[in-house]
């Protein structure tokens, strides 16, 4: 069963432009994951949210250490704070109907 990790982040200096966010994602080594997808979106001037979709809970758990290291670096580099995080199995998905 696919597994999702949702997060919300606070940017003290404001959320960067889409191009800057894409550059941050590329810099963070997005290719260094087995996630099926990583999606970031802006919700206001100082917050963005993200969704990571993994093939399974086991794989999400195996990548937890890598995620934590990347988050610590991102916090230091971008002056951001994790506001909330939720994880769980994906119960339904339109693309799989």
Name each model feature, range by range.
Residues 1-49, 53-69, 76-97:
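Short S/T/G/P-rich N-terminal loop/turn motif that feeds into the first structured element of a domain
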